[in-house]
């Protein structure tokens, strides 16, 4: 019987900086952080900016909406959408060790009626029929251990992202990296959404 090739995933570790705990993927790059005494606070400015979609919706409707995070990180967005906004929330994460770390060290709740984590490839998962046209807030933060560029950054991927959204749905993407090209990423998003639909925060 043929053996399936095993995907090599980076080890997960963390560090402490005063009241803040950081998640790392086998490198110095911070993949997410948590204020230990206030685990749902959004510590980093870029994470706060990924909540910019709230500017475009009626606050009274937020709890009735659905959020989907591609990339769990330290679970900041997942915890915030679930606990603070009371939204139905799902995260898709490739690395089971990241999920284990989030549950053990970053106070991510167990799966429940309003929150779940799916272990899998985000690019494949979002193409499943269950995600078509149902997501109100899609939050994309997909980096490897080197944090050099988004690991999923193609026009086809962004077209699949758009297909998950409701009519009022919004996608926020963390664009950061030592070798990533901001404009090239924007052009790929524009191919799916149209340049007029893109905003920088």
Where on the chain are the PLM-derived regions?
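Glycine-centered flexibility motif
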Residues: 32, 120-122, 194
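N-terminal auxiliary segments of SAM/dcSAM-dependent transferases
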Residues: 1-30
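A short, flexible beta-alpha/helix-coil linker loop
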Residues: 28-32, 143-146, 171
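Short acidic, glycine/proline-rich loop/turn micro-motifs
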Residues: 33-37
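The AdoMet/dcAdoMet-binding core of the Class I SAM-like
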Residues: 5, 38-167, 180
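C-terminal substrate-binding/active-site "lid" region of AdoMet-derived donor-dependent transferases
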Residues: 155-201
């Amino acid at each position: 019987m043929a053996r399936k090739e095993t995907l090599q995933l980076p080890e997960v570790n963390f560090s402490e900086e005063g009241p803040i705990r950081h998640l790392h993927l086998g490198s110095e790059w911070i993949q997410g952080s948590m204020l230990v005494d206030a685990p749902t606070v959004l510590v980093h400015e870029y994470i706060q900016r990924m909540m910019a979609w709230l500017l475009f919706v009626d606050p009274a409707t937020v709890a009735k909406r659905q959020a989907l995070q591609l990339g769990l990180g330290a679970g900041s967005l997942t915890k915030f959408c679930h606990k603070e906004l009371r939204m139905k929330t799902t995260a898709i994460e490739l690395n089971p060790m990241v999920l284990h770390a989030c549950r053990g060290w970053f106070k991510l709740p167990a799966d429940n009626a309003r929150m779940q984590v799916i272990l899998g490839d985000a690019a494949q998962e979002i193409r499943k029929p269950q995600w078509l046209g149902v997501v109100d807030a899609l939050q994309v933060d997909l980096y490897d251990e080197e944090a050099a560029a988004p690991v999923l950054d193609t026009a086809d991927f962004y077209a699949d992202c758009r297909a998950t959204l409701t009519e009022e749905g919004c996608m926020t993407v963390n664009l950061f990296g030592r070798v990533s090209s901001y404009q090239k990423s924007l052009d790929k998003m524009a191919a799916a959404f149209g340049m007029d639909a893109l905003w920088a925060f």
